[in-house]
Amino acid sequence: MMFATKRGTRDVYGETLAELGHQDPSIVVLTADLAGSTKTSIFAAEHPDRFYNMGVAEANMIGTAAGFALSGFRPFVSTFAMFATGKAWEQIRQVVAYPKTPVRIVATHAGLTVGEDGASHQMLEDIGNMRVLPNMSIIAPSDAIEAAGAIRFVAAYDDGPVYVRLARAPFPVIHDEGHTFEFGKAEILAQGTDVTIAACGLMVSVALEAHEVLAGDGIAAEVVNVSSIKPLDRETLLTSARKTGVVVTAEEHQIVNGLGSAICELLSEELPTLVVRVGVDDRFGQSGNADALLAHYGLDVDGLIAATKHALSKANG
C-alpha cells in the first residue's frame, strides 16, 4: 500500500490552533522558547495578545497554564515531548493531573523520528509518564487529519487534562478529509481474522502497509488504530482479540508502559491472549534519519511483518 500524501502532525497542529483562535477567544497558547519548532508560531502571528513565550522554563509554563485554566481560559502548552513530559513532570502531576485542571499539553518531536538530534531529544517514555497519572487522557493521532480533529476536540474538552503526542517528521495521511475524530474510540482500519495489529501514531500507516504484504502471504491481519490510548477502547480491542486470538502492538515508544503495556493489562484481566509488543525494547535512541532509525529498531514494515509472523508462530506452537 502506497500513500500519496505525507504531512507532519505538528504542522497541522499549528494551522488548526490558529484557526480555533479566531473561533474561541478563551484559547491561550504557551510555549517554552520553541514556537517555530512546535508550529505555535502560526497562532502567535495571528493572536499575539494570547500567546506567551515562557522561555526555557517548562515547569513554570505548566504552572502558568494551570492558572489560566482556573481563571476561565483554555490553555494549550507546547514544547518537545522530552521537555513537556520529562522536565515538567512534577508540575504536571501536582497542579494539572491531581486537581484535574483542564490544561492541553500538546507535545511535538515525540519518538525516534526526531532523527539527527539523537537520544537526548528522542522521547520514548512520554506515554508511560502520562499514562501513570490519574485524570490524564492521552491521544496519539495516526495522521495529520486525525491530529486536526484531535486538536479541535481537546480545545472544547474541559473535563480534565489531555496529552496529545505529535511527531516532527511527516508521515502518511491515511484518512480522508471528512474523517471525524472520536475520543476514547479505537478504529478498525482493515478487517482480519488471523491476527490483530493494534497501533498508534505513525505506526498505524506501517501496520496498514504490513497488512497488504501479509495478505499476499495468506495472513489476514486486522489493523486497529488506537489513537486514544487513555481512555482505552476496551470493547473494540477485546472484540478484535477474541476474533483473532493473537495480538501484535506497534508503537514508536518503549514497549514498557506504552500502548503495548496498556493492551497487555487489559487482556491479562479480561481475555488472556498472546501479545507481541513491537516498539523500542529497553534501549535509548540514537542519531540518524527517520527511516533508518525505524528500520534499525524494527519499526518499519519489514520489522512489523517479522514480528507478526513470529507471534503467529508462537501461537500455533
Task: Pin down the residues of each PLM region.
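Thiamine diphosphate
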Residues: 1-165, 170, 180, ...
